[in-house]
Amino acid sequence: MAVIGGVALYFMTRTKWTPPAAAQPYLPDIMAAEYQNGMPRYLLARLLYQESRYRQDIITGKTTSSAGAVGIAQIVPKWHPDVNPLNVSESIYYAAKYLTKLKNQFGDWETALAAYNWGMGNVNNAMKSNGYKWLASAPTETQNYVSDIWGDVA
């Protein structure tokens, strides 16, 4: 009985992720983009936190990733030339639409998150090679990316 009570207590006291104060200026666009794309609440907010931590140096492009990713959604202009990654509102809506496209392609949000982080081609190749155990063959960074975001949202 103690174990069951402990499990119940865990779920009763577990707190879901909530956006940090730095996210507040962007929440109207984030919430609208999530709603328009049928996303779980705070999925996009959590993705953007994972990508930029809502740090101004990243959002403004002063700091870029080693892969050339820029802005709040860490968009690589070479792969996504139709969006201005330094336009915050445009990037938020683009990231939501792109993640939803990935979800529709792969069938679930977890795989969509992996594809956002690691790339569609890499996820497709891993699925072909490893079947349903594909995530175990993904880089640790991608495994952590998915669990950090989805674990806080689901």
Feature-to-residue mapping (PLM):
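Single-pass alpha-helical membrane anchors
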Residues: 1-17
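Catalytic glycan-binding domains that act on GlcNAc-containing polysaccharides
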Residues: 15-154
